[in-house]
Structure formats: C-alpha cells, structure tokens
Amino acid sequence: TKTADFTVAATESYLINNKTTTSCVVTLPTASSWSGRSLNFTNYQAQTLVSASSNVVARTGGAAGTAILAATVGAWAQIVSDGSNWLTIAGS
C-alpha cells in the first residue's frame, strides 16, 4: 500500500494507491527492461494515479500519456510493457 509518490520495485506487481491529499505519482520501470511484464494498480482513495513519464497508453490507444487511474475509489488498471510503453489492457 502506497501513501506517497513511489517507484515500482522489481519485486512488486500489485500496487495500491492510498495517498490521501493529492494525485499519486508513480515512477514505472523502463518499458524496454520489463517487456511482457504486467503491473496491477488499485485506488483506495479518490485521487488520480499518474506516471512520472509519458509512457502509458490508454485502452483506447493513441499517444502515450501519464494517466493510469481516475480519481475514483475502487478504480483499477492492469498495464503491460510492450518493450516501448506500458499498455493499459484492462481496468475500470
């Protein structure tokens, strides 16, 4: 459970955003170093979760941005590295 901005560790794959006051910023691993690996995020607070870099592609496609989770309690997303970016493959 994360209560402040954070960097994803090599041993983590399920991450809970529990930061209460502002958007939570996550530094994702470089997509090229984690090709094929997935990460799962869930919101326990009504705060957005965003990447520190523009490297997340929405389920609808398009250019990579920073958005991972909306500011909704219970929001969740699964992202997978394609070697270039993190692709959102499932979520609410």
Model feature map: region roles:
Residues T1-A58, D82-S92:
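Exposed extracellular interaction/assembly regions and N-terminal maturation sites
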Residues T30, A71-T72:
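Intrinsically disordered, low-complexity coil segments
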Residues L39, A64-I68, A77, W86:
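Polar low-complexity intrinsically disordered regions enriched in Ser/Thr and small residues
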Residues N55-A71:
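Terminal beta-strand-rich extracellular "head" domains
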Residues T72-D82:
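Extracellular disulfide-bonded cysteine-rich modules/repeats
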